[in-house]
């Protein structure tokens, strides 16, 4: 076997990005139309115009497909070097926009339920995705404390939970539609608190 063929054999066939995109687009459409429970791998395959084997070569479960369809790839740039107040405001507006997307609203409750049923799924679908953001936010907050921009003792994990939790609950549970108002109100509470100064 030639070196090139050995390499192809070890790596497997090249993935066709058009199939990936068709599957993810079909998944987003079906989530909006049918919700998480009503979205199946069969329906995704039919809508995308691909076979089930092509899907299972790429994703081990419906939960993994849905996750990739609604969540962008998380990179370290998720936290910037803005002043800490502006950075927190940016994270709030970004979380509200992400969790307010029509497909994401339908996906989140199902993904959370799946994550509760399996530690492996919880890590793959929830924890690992947020880890980069948590680490970067913690780094930025530590710098802000040193610079006198942020009071000491604010836990970055709790702050991120407050932001994501409020964005998810308001939009996936309460079905709030006014994203701008939600984000502005959440930013005001997070940055300024609720007690009179």
Regions inferred by a protein language model and the residue ranges of each:
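Amphipathic alpha-helical packing segments from all-alpha helical-bundle domains
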Residues: 86, 106, 120-146, 156-158
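C-terminal peripheral helix-coil segments that are non-catalytic and often amphipathic
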Residues: 1-7, 90-97, 135, 139-146, ...
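Short amphipathic alpha-helix in the helical subdomain of ABC transporter nucleotide-binding domains
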Residues: 16, 133, 152-160, 179, ...
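Amphipathic alpha-helical segments used for helix-helix packing
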Residues: 66, 70, 99-127
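Basic, helix-initiating cap at the start of DNA-binding domains
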Residues: 1-34, 38-47, 53, 64, ...
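Hydrophobic alpha-helical connector segments
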Residues: 76-108, 159
């Amino acid at each position: 076997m030639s070196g090139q063929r050995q390499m192809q054999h070890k790596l497997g066939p090249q993935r066709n990005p058009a199939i990936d995109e068709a599957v993810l687009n079909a998944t987003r459409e079906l989530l909006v139309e049918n919700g998480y429970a009503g979205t199946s791998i069969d329906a995704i395959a039919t809508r995308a115009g691909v076979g089930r084997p092509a899907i299972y070569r790429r994703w081990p479960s419906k939960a993994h497909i849905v996750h990739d369809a609604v969540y962008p790839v998380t990179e370290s740039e998720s936290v910037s070097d803005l002043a800490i107040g502006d950075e927190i405001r940016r994270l709030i507006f970004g979380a509200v926009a992400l969790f307010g997307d029509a497909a994401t609203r339908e996906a989140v409750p199902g993904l959370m339920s799946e994550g509760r049923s399996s530690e492996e799924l919880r890590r793959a679908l929830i924890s690992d995705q947020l880890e980069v953001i948590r680490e970067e936010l913690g780094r930025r907050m530590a710098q802000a404390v040193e610079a006198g921009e942020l009071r000491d003792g604010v836990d970055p994990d709790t702050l991120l939970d407050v932001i994501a939790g409020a964005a998810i609950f308001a939009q996936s549970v309460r079905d709030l539609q006014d994203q701008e108002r939600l984000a502005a109100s959440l930013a005001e509470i997070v940055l300024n608190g609720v007690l009179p100064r």
